[in-house]
Amino acid sequence: MYKKIDGSKSFVQMEREVLDFWNKNNIVDKSFALNEEGEYFTFYDGPPTANGKPHVGHVLTRVIKDLIPRYKVMKGYKVLRKAGWDTHGLPVELEIEKKLGISGKEEIEKFGVEEFIKECKDSVFTYSSMWKDMSEKLAFWVDMENPYVTYHNDYIESVWWALKQLWNKELLYKGHKVIPYCPRCGTALSSHEVAQGYKDVKEATAFVKFKVKGEENKYILAWTTTPWTLPSNVALAINKNFDYVEVKNNDEVLILAKELVDSVIDGEYEIIKEFKGEDILGLQYEQLLPFYTPEEEAFRVIHGDFVTLSDGTGIVHTAPAYGEDDNIVCKKHGLPMINLVDKEGKFIDCVEPWKGMPVKKADSKIIEYMDEKGILYKSEKFTHSYPHCWRCDTALLYYPTDSWFVRMTSLRDKLLENNNKVNWYPDNIRTGRFGKFLENVIDWGISRDRYWGTPLPIWECECGHRECIGSISELKEKGIDVPEDIELHKPYIDKVKLKCSKCGKEMKRTREVIDCWFDSGSMPFAQHHYPFENKEVFEKTFPAQFISEAVDQTRGWFYTLTAISTAIFDTNPFENCIVLGHVLDKHGLKMSKSKGNVVDPFDVLDSAGADASRWHFYTASAPWLPTRFSPEDVEETQRKFLSTLWNVYSFYVLYADIDKFNPLEYKDFVSENVMDKWIVSKLNSLIKDVEDHMDSYRITQAALAIEDFVDELSNWYVRRNRSRFWSEELREDKIGAYVTLYKVLTTVSLIAAPFVPFITEEIYNNLVRGLDKNALESIHLCNWPKYDENLIQKELEREMDEAYKIVKLGRSARNSVNIKNRQPLSSMLVSIKTLPEYYGRIIKDELNIKDIIFGADLSSYVEFNIKPNLPVLGKAYGRYIPQIRKEITSMDQMKLAQKIKQGEKVIINIDGNEIELNEENLLVTMKGLEGFAFAGEGNIGVVLNTTITDELKEEGQLREILSKIQNMRKEKEFEVADRIKLYVSGNRMLESVVEKFEDIIRKETIAEEVIYNEEREYVDCKINGEDFKIEVEAIK
């Protein structure tokens, strides 16, 4: 009836067989085709770059992004699962530069832009097979046969349409600003790109003396972390409201903020004058490094709101060419800009000592030069966060350049309004990391002076007229001799000229391409080639109900999606977003090649399998928290959950196959067994709870609810009901056990199917398809199970849960005194009020005790030790510790311990101070007195009587003997139904135990005969420390 389970087969082998089944039967495509008439549920797949290898972080994103759509398909929704590839931008260009052995724009131009573009296009899918392989092994089901690709003409055309909308709304403009600039890549970067590349660096800073004009030995003391900007200084900024002083130090008079004198001035000093900052506004000084002197008036003290007293001297050197704040304040005061750095980040010729030198490398040389000239007060190393290029890792410069911008500052309020409509997981992202970024939003520098990207569709005429093109048809309509099959990339698009509608001359396209993040942020509409095609599909699937990516994307994709959607559609682009934490190594450290702690996801998939990897990420921690990931972690997950589920499934198949039991013949059978009713109630509660969690994106809670249920199914239901399956005749009680376990296994497989798609498919194919060839072909084509409120009995669940909890506490108490469960004990006391007798029998049987007393006062049997947790309580109330100890000692120790363990507040009053005692600031230990063992949790405590009489000792020996015999049957690979002969010898005392309990032994081990002291080979055993010889033999 059922396919026999191969115990030697690994989960990985099973998963490969399931993959073959899916591929041969087109199960993935059939899943995509489900629910054609259903309501749409949309999720967006943030596009990875296929010219980079996938890593463990991508395993996390894929298993989260796969789970929700699977669940929604089972719930009847039509889910579009379109894969995408992010193909433009610096990441691709840098890889090609490496491949070709060239570096920088000049060498690209020499190589040839057309050939360079071809190389970029050919490279973008370098690792696509690796991505597809990982996705298939993980069962990440997205349509990879028809993906959206950001370099395709259709996609670019939709992006052009979006840019035209911005143009029409006057949100796209050209400006000359000081913005972040990568000298290595030769292009400006946007604020969200900059936010992804900050690093803590330790660099030399300079305290510099600017000589006051017309004064001897009087200097204004300023501090800078970027000495290379000093040749371009035009002003010194102070805060007019701060207190400043003149300080005499080493025969020089230095001006600086009063509050910072002690931290800055070395040696002895004398304050000779105090004044407000406003008193020195306009004070002139001599140019510090006069390599280039501007014609305009400069070199004076001005007010700047950005000046603080947190570090430095309270006086800020200001170079408007290299700082946004500097640029704004200097423009306000009519000061000139001195730019002495070229676009490669090197000093120009007039800076004679360092001409042609990269500016960051010149810092130390400039400090040495100033020291020689006597204008350096001192230099110190300083650690600060400095932006680096997010792709090539070069330190960025703030640099004046022409660039195209999207006017995001005008949309700030709308961005915040749309952000507030999103359900963020975790919720603090809304007002924290993402919300703060939006509050401080600046205009988006969208243009890149590079090659491989979506060309900015703006044409300019020398008369000053500009035109933005929003489609290929518009390009052909307005362009001159546009090829029919026009390729929209550089250099082909640059050959297209437009006729100026103002003066009639030829218009040329501006040379820039756009930020590749604009490409990915356009995917909600561009993936459908909207508005040129699929208008209805886009309108039905926008905004998305769900997206999920790593926390870094709060500065990346989450932002660009929000920015573009707000600017064009005036709404939020997604409704629910799970923000994923970082994946760490087994020690909780960030993975890096330099540390040698990088885990290869393919190694883990090949050793432990996809289901285990998926389940680990669902249960190890909330998705937004950092997660440790290692082969050992995944293997532990496999053992704890998958193996438990598999063992229950194997148990059912083994016995159902022996009995040729077909549950389809008992569809209407209703079991009256209490355990069956309990597990069915728990099953229906599980469906309801998991559904509630999943509808609210509480993935970890949903997965842990399933894990807890499977644990109870295995370690409580099956454990308590094994004898029902072992009984020889197929009576009602056995039928009830089979019907119940079958129902539970098939239903829990449906519930777990979105989480662990492989093992659930295997179980479904054997238990459901194996019996009914008309059943749906795959579990992943099935609907989500419906719960039945009439089958949920909360009182029954509470009672059984309490019984199970008492059993677990009883086991814990036994362990605390090293008494095995096979050794019977006389009695157990339980603190809670009585449970129905049925549960008492279960507890006694499980714990191997003779008697149980409910509602007992345990205080006479337990020793309590309650004392302050000094590192916590001492820190807050150190001087009161002796009084606190005294107060604790005077209280009822058991009641105090119970309150603390149950999380109740306990307030004591010491010298008028109310002090709360809790589990954090108290150390509570409880143990049984001599002859007793104690364990407690929450409101339940248990005490075992550990005195063992001779009669109890004999029963314990019986249990040990039975265990040894059953293990020998397994080792000899006897079938469950095989009858045996039992031979014992070598210990008269233990032989008498066998004689006394022979009937029980024969029944439990299916022994036809027990033979004593026969001459033969035996297995030497230890029974509670006693030597004994046992042998078993199958009866042919």
Swiss-Prot record:
| Residues that hold ATP according to the record | K593
Q: Where is the signal peptide?
A: none
Disulfide cysteine pairs (residue numbers)? none
In chain numbering, where does the motif 'KMSKS' region fall?
A: 590-594
Question: Which keywords appear in this protein's UniProt record, sorted alphabetically?
Answer: Aminoacyl-tRNA synthetase, ATP-binding, Cytoplasm, Ligase, Metal-binding, Nucleotide-binding, Protein biosynthesis, Zinc
The answer to whether keyword Nucleotide-binding applies is: yes
Q: Please give the catalytic activity noted in the UniProt record.
A: tRNA(Ile) + L-isoleucine + ATP = L-isoleucyl-tRNA(Ile) + AMP + diphosphate
Q: Which Pfam families match?
A: Anticodon_1, DUF5915, tRNA-synt_1
Report the EC code(s) recorded for this entry. Answer: 6.1.1.5
Instruction: Name the cofactor(s).
Output: Zn(2+)
Q: Which GO terms describe its biological process?
A: isoleucyl-tRNA aminoacylation
List the record's Gene Ontology CC terms alphabetically: cytoplasm
Motif 'HIGH' region per UniProt: ranges: 48-58
The Gene Ontology terms for molecular function here are:
aminoacyl-tRNA deacylase activity; ATP binding; isoleucine-tRNA ligase activity; tRNA binding; zinc ion binding
Where does this chain mainly localize? cytoplasm
Known role: Catalyzes the attachment of isoleucine to tRNA(Ile). As IleRS can inadvertently accommodate and process structurally similar amino acids such as valine, to avoid such errors it has two additional distinct tRNA(Ile)-dependent editing activities. One activity is designated as 'pretransfer' editing and involves the hydrolysis of activated Val-AMP. The other activity is designated 'posttransfer' editing and involves deacylation of mischarged Val-tRNA(Ile).
Q: Which family does it belong to?
A: Belongs to the class-I aminoacyl-tRNA synthetase family. IleS type 2 subfamily.
The domain-related comment in the record is:
IleRS has two distinct active sites: one for aminoacylation and one for editing. The misactivated valine is translocated from the active site to the editing site, which sterically excludes the correctly activated isoleucine. The single editing site contains two valyl binding pockets, one specific for each substrate (Val-AMP or Val-tRNA(Ile)).
> Which protein is depicted?
Isoleucine--tRNA ligase
Gene that produces this protein: ileS
